[in-house]
């Protein structure tokens, strides 16, 4: 039985999927902890409390009554970060990051995050060319968004064995960035990715990125920058217009996950294919 105050923005399958108590089964602390962990991982409840009491009945004196009380958290969160940077090339200026999160955007614990960042720097006389302050200022503006599902969303990853003991997430990410460097260049970049993070045991974690795309393009350059690139072909390669698809897999084995140990051992393996490798396969 589910009792709630209307309106409630929660899909019908969310609670049954994350509550591991079943009528007629033997009660265990592990089941209670698993239920609390599942509900807490959704990120939509401020508090989750489980109360277990014996039934006041002579007929079913061997049974327990389980009551779960959950309080919804505020779905929207906003953050603002401000900073000031001073660099060795005499550039100084402020930076600002504004972020907003919706912790239950589709009613199933999905988290939508949007972050806007910007910075502006100007050059003081101490490090400027010919002892004069630069007439051109350095700035950077970026917009990044991500959508996180607290479960595996069917797609590029094969169907995993059904398990609710460990967390699993699917993330979609999109971003764009504009960078201006005085006396050198103005460059724009775009990126997008899809990734899966899940655990198959208490110690083994997996991160699969079947698709990631990065695109960079120089909008304009100065004569000084072009001359430097001609003199340094190796550096010039990193500034060419690039369209880079990639895929990656990371396996992490952590002996301390879920418990306290004196000696912690972490082993991580990562494999990635990008650029020319993918081009060779398609050709």
What is each residue range found by the language model?
Residues 1, 7-10, 127-283:
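Transmembrane beta-strand segments of outer-membrane beta-barrel domains in Gram-negative
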């Amino acid at each position: 039985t589910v009792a709630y105050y209307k309106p409630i923005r929660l899909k019908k399958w969310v609670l049954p999927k994350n509550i591991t108590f079943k009528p007629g089964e033997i009660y265990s602390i592990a089941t209670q902890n698993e239920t609390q962990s599942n509900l807490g991982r959704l990120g939509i409840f401020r508090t989750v409390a489980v109360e277990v009491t014996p039934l006041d009945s002579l007929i079913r004196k061997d049974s327990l009554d389980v009551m779960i009380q959950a309080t919804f958290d505020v779905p929207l969160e906003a953050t603002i970060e401000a900073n000031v940077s001073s660099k060795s090339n005499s550039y100084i200026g402020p930076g600002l990051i504004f972020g907003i999160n919706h912790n239950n955007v589709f009613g199933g614990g999905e988290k939508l995050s949007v972050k806007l960042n910007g910075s502006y720097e100007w050059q003081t006389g101490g490090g400027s060319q010919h002892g004069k302050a630069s007439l051109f200022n350095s700035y950077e503006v970026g917009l990044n968004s991500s959508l996180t599902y607290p479960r595996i969303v069917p797609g590029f990853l094969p169907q995993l064995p059904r398990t609710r003991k460990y967390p699993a997430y699917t993330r979609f990410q999109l971003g764009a960035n504009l960078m201006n460097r005085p006396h050198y260049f103005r460059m724009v970049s775009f990126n997008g990715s899809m990734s899966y993070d899940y655990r198959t045991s208490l110690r083994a974690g997996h991160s699969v990125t079947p698709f990631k795309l990065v695109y960079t393009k120089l909008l304009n350059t100065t004569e000084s920058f072009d001359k430097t690139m001609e003199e340094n072909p190796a550096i010039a390669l990193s500034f060419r217009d690039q369209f880079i698809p990639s895929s990656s897999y990371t396996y992490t084995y952590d002996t301390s996950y879920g418990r306290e140990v004196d000696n912690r051992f972490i082993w991580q393996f990562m494999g990635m294919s990008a650029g020319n490798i993918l081009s060779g396969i398609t050709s």
